[in-house]
Amino acid sequence: MSGFHRHRRSKLIIANFSGFEADLLRSLAGQLVELLRNEAAVPRDDVDPFEAMMDFSGPTQEPEDPVLARLFPTAYPDDEEAASEFRRFTEGALRDGKAAAAVTIIDTLEEAGLPEQLTEDGLMIDVELDEPTAETWMRSFTDLRLALATRLGVEEGDEAYWHALPEDDPRAQAHDIYAWVGYLQETLVDALSR
């Protein structure tokens, strides 16, 4: 696990993942895409055809899923009507953008040689990202970390709790994944700044 760095000559952002790491990233990104698209795909009977054509027919209520509520917070907590209108006009495009960013991770890993089914031990995946693609990965890492933190109940200053969990506790393992994605994001930000 070396994280991201900028190649001196090509100026591309590069990382080297084991097959397991690449497959884990693909799985996390795939789960995020599924979450974003499944709730958004619920048909609504009250959609105005013009609004649908202009993509102004998004949801008006805060999502029930806590991860989605964290990814799409209420813009105006003190004004329910304004919050509803803001969500209606923006959430659909935001969901599409977040899903597209996660799909970029999946596509990049597969283009770099990650097979559909990981069967080979010792497989290494070399990823090379131009700046726009690296920025897309960075945005998706933010969404992945928010999703993991929400599911785990991670809060600021609670590191001692997570470190005290036994290694075989599934929550500790999930927190390790959360920390790993944070590490990847940190190295990606650093590589982009060079």
Predicted regions and their residues:
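Charged, alpha-helix-forming regions
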Residues: 1-128, 132-194
